From Swiss-Prot:
<feature type="transmembrane region" description="Helical">
    <location>
        <begin position="30"/>
        <end position="50"/>
    </location>
</feature>
<dbReference type="GO" id="GO:0005886">
    <property type="term" value="C:plasma membrane"/>
</dbReference>
<dbReference type="Pfam" id="PF07043">
    <property type="entry name" value="DUF1328"/>
</dbReference>
<keyword id="KW-1133">Transmembrane helix</keyword>
<protein>
    <recommendedName>
        <fullName>UPF0391 membrane protein Patl_0263</fullName>
    </recommendedName>
</protein>
<keyword id="KW-1003">Cell membrane</keyword>
<dbReference type="InterPro" id="IPR009760">
    <property type="entry name" value="DUF1328"/>
</dbReference>
<comment type="similarity">
    <text>Belongs to the UPF0391 family.</text>
</comment>
<keyword id="KW-0812">Transmembrane</keyword>
<keyword id="KW-0472">Membrane</keyword>
<feature type="transmembrane region" description="Helical">
    <location>
        <begin position="8"/>
        <end position="28"/>
    </location>
</feature>
Length: 57
């Protein structure tokens, strides 16, 4: 999933140079969604790992 996020990020940067038009603008939107999902998963799993670590002490 992170590979796709990086791919769409690169396409999004290229789109920014050319003004976010057409299909590339859609790629930038997809990159934002994938990035936010990855951040949400990192936060979720960090909280779960912290709780599990605290429980086993």
């Amino acid at each position: 999933m992170l590979t796709w996020a990086l791919t769409f990020f690169v396409l999004g940067v290229i789109a920014a140079v050319f003004g976010f038009g057409g299909v590339i603008g859609v790629a930038a939107s997809i990159a934002k969604v994938i990035f936010l999902l990855c951040v949400a998963f990192v936060v979720l799993f960090s909280v779960l790992a912290f709780k599990q670590h605290k429980r086993h002490k």
